[in-house]
Every structure is written in C-alpha cells, then in structure tokens.
C-alpha cells in the first residue's frame, strides 16, 4: 500500500502534475483533477493514502 505526499507542480486544464516529496528525482505524476480535492493550487501539498488524495 503506497502512502506518500505530493506537491502540485503544475495545473494544466483538467490535469495536475504532482511531484513526490520523498523522491523528487522521479518523473511527475499526471492525475485527473476530478480525483483531487477541488481547492488544490500550484504549490500546495497533498497526502495520498488508500487511493485518495487529501490537502495537507
């Protein structure tokens, strides 16, 4: 089970580009905004656990 934190690096229309805080060298993860909290903004932190994203 993956548990990690992300930073929203870019919002591009219906998608957000996320960077893992514990592995910044990894490729950015592209996630549909429909799966993310509505109040996200570039630079905010998200917590991922049990296939859900929450604002940190």
Annotate each predicted stretch with a short phrase.
Residues 50-56:
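Short, Lys/Arg- and Gly-enriched loop/turn segments at beta-strand edges
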Residues 14-18:
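Short aromatic-glycine-enriched beta-strand elements
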Residues 1-12:
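Structural detector for short beta-strands of small beta-barrel domains
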